[in-house]
Amino acid sequence: MNINLDSAKDTFCKNVLIYGYCKYENKGCAFSHTVKPTSSVPGSQGSNATTNSSGNTNADMKKKFNFNTPSFQPSTVPNLTNKFSNLSPNLKEIPVFVPSGGMSNADSGGMNEPEMNDSVTPNKKFNASTPSFMPSNPYISNNDQISAPSPVMAQSVSTPGAKANGNIQHNPYLPGNAGTPQPTSAVAAPNSADVFFQQPTSSYPLQHHLYAPAPPPRLTIPLPPHEINVNSMFIPNDLRETLLKRNEATLQTLPRSNLPDHVNIYHSLVPIDTSFENISKVYELPSFVYKVFSNVDGNPYALRKIDIQSVLRITNELPFKYIKKWKSVKCANIVQLQEAFTSMAFGGSYSSLIVTYDYFPNSNTLQEQHISRRLGGKLEPITEELLWNYVIEITNALINIHENNLAARSALHLSKILVTNKNRVRLGGVGISDILNYEDDEEQIQQKGLDAFRHELQQADIKKFGKLILDLAALCLPNNARNHEPKDLISLLKTSTTVNFSGEFINLLTELNMNTSDLQEFNRNHLSRRILNFCSNAQDSQDFMESQLSTELENARVFRLITKLNFIIDRPEYDNDPNWQENGNKYIIKLFRDYIFFQYDEFGKPVCDLSRVLTNLNKLDAGIDEKFLLVNKDEKNCIIVSYKEIRDIIDSAFRTLTRG
């Protein structure tokens, strides 16, 4: 491409037009990269009034808007001509808008005729002499009425009289509504002096990263055995973040909701069910789950409300006769049932069935974990090792249930089994089927006998268990291959090239779905060897948690020491105390505080070394005899002192303070 260098220097570079910059600007690009200013030059205030008329005409023709252009006056319509005949084409005669109520008449009168220079006004883009808009006071008016809403009233304003009618109906299940309820709004009544601004309670973001996270393993610098970094002094970031989120979920509240304030001994109801289904597919009745707090012990619980309506009329204690048995079942893989009762607290013409369980914050169901993704979550892939863990844990739960002459029944469903921790599942919703099906169960017991009926229910549990594990394993197959009979699904899992299940696991699926009638025998034949691996992993997890707990064990000791320092330093009553002056014996405490937190490096930047702070505080708390140098801020005075001497001075000052 041939470029004329003489003409190219006056041509604007297209790279700047297209991309905003030219990467060859300083590397030999021949085109121009200088952006020409497009702003017009305003006329000078001291310009000569006798300017050439032709020059003014040309300047006015180049302008897009000309203030000297007269207003449009139609002459063909008589009525409109008379209406607009009084308008003046001169800008200085146009009245200035002054809002009513913004200022007194005396003040606004002087603004109606601002002084303007004819030679200056047409060239100004913005007229500085135009008065600024002053909104009217919403509380003061000549006629004691609010003629127009003020911009201030656009905020969330409510009055005591309108607060009850200002509640906005909102869906408590939508994310963000639980922590951020919609603010109420109402129009302020005339002559009302009690208007106040109601701030909505919004959920604040959790400060998970209180310190810098650990770098990826591939970027981690190997350290000698005698060196450690800051991250090794605290629990891992993922574990800390998980615990913080659980704590936040436990303490979450929902103010100004339509839910009842109290249900029996429980209060502070917060919806935690994320299924968005009013009718439960398991119970075939409206069912909702809430997090509540107990008035008795103050602990959080999960409250399930079932609208039994006319399906079941509970008039006595007979439907709850198995609740006492369920409360006695203690198993690590079962969500503990607390109590069951009926209540009219939710309104309506029928009472609701209320069943409360232990609460596990931020727990997912197996359906949310692997099938239907929860809002903001990710689906966990199915692996053979994960399924072995599920089989062992659910088998443990079923054995405990069957030994107490009970049956899991509706609890063996993907939407009722909770994943409370990594590879940790618990059967939830136990005991509800015994209440809802009480009348039918009594008829079956009279026909078959109690033992035969219980044995039948327990065999149904085993079949549901096998079907549940098979459905989870079938998630590894394509969608069109999952809707088959159990025998066909097992054959597909065995012959599929995309699934790598071992023969041992295929035999387990076959035995569980075809032949098993006794869980104890199934446990001995198929799970005995796998249980040893499960116990080993559980003990490794226990050792990990214990090691993390040991790293946090001494945090309270350091916190108490920092609290003492802040109690005694910079108190107002010590301003004139000679002991806290530069020559006083307690001035060392201030120097030690500066030595720990107010250090600067050789470049004048603050030193924020957490390991150094912890090291010095640990030495101070231990009271060792190590001596070091303390220097004041102007570096004119210095003192050599030991940690033991400083600790004694701090203890003495704190005792003096507490004695008062």
Curated annotation (Swiss-Prot):
A motif (PABPC-interacting motif-2 (PAM-2)) lies at residues 59-79. One of its GO terms (biological process) is mRNA processing. Residues 36-60, 150-186 are annotated as: Disordered. Gene3D superfamilies: 1.10.287.3700, 1.20.5.5160, 6.10.250.3160, Transferase(Phosphotransferase) domain 1. Residues 568-660 are annotated as: Knob domain. ATP binds at R304, D358, Y359, F360, P361, N362, S363, N364, T365, S415, K416. GO terms for cellular component: P-body; PAN complex. The keyword ATP-binding applies. A zinc finger (C3H1-type) spans 7-36. Keywords: ATP-binding, Coiled coil, Cytoplasm, Metal-binding, mRNA processing, Nucleotide-binding, Zinc, Zinc-finger. Pfam families: Pan3_PK. Residues 529-567 form a coiled coil. It is found in: Cytoplasm. Residues 43-59 have a biased composition (Low complexity). Residues 150-159 have a biased composition (Polar residues). Residues 252-528 are annotated as: Pseudokinase domain. Belongs to the protein kinase superfamily. PAN3 family. HAMAP family: PAN3. The N-terminal zinc finger binds to poly(A) RNA. Regulatory subunit of the poly(A)-nuclease (PAN) deadenylation complex, one of two cytoplasmic mRNA deadenylases involved in mRNA turnover. PAN specifically shortens poly(A) tails of RNA and the activity is stimulated by poly(A)-binding protein PAB1. PAN deadenylation is followed by rapid degradation of the shortened mRNA tails by the CCR4-NOT complex. Deadenylated mRNAs are then degraded by two alternative mechanisms, namely exosome-mediated 3'-5' exonucleolytic degradation, or deadenylation-dependent mRNA decaping and subsequent 5'-3' exonucleolytic degradation by XRN1. This is PAN2-PAN3 deadenylation complex subunit PAN3. The lineage of its organism: Eukaryota, Fungi, Dikarya, Ascomycota, Saccharomycotina.
